[in-house]
Amino acid sequence: MKNHIFKAYFNAKSASFNFRYDRALLLVRNPLHQILAFTDWKTRNLHNNTRLPLKFYQDFLDPFFNKHVELWQKWHERVLESFSAENICVINYEDLRENVLEELQKCTQFLGFDIQNHILQNCILQNQTGHHKRTARPFGETQLILSFLSKKTRLKSDEIYEKTLQKLLNNSYHSDKCMG
């Protein structure tokens, strides 16, 4: 069994990426938030905490998101085509943020680890932050940026996200073994 971990920022090439792994642990994030995080990461010049001006988002956000939300969907569909349900564990990023222990237990169960709750909990509590963590946007800025999107783009993105996430959850180890 090939045991590799990779982090993929999606683009046109990754939608047709050939997966060469036996199993996958897939962290799924709302595409609107993922695209914003990716844009921040890509434009921050080695994590110097400079951000794109809000004017950039006002002028370019809608066409940029329309293109990338579709790529996000294609990439995730490609993942589903590449792995059988028992060989993919789907973790929703938003759920992970709210229920860290529960979601990480799903990961460890999928990977075959026998970790007791108190050991996992201590590890998580001691390592939640670090020098690698980028600073968060100022309060309310994400919602302001997302408000620049047209209603049509927002609805399209929400629909793609919900549909794709449900499809992933219904066709993965997550839904079969980890729900109860």
Language-model features, listed with the residues they occupy:
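Short beta-strand segments
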Residues: 6-7, 26, 90-92
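PAPS-dependent sulfotransferase catalytic domain
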Residues: 45-106, 110-111, 115-118
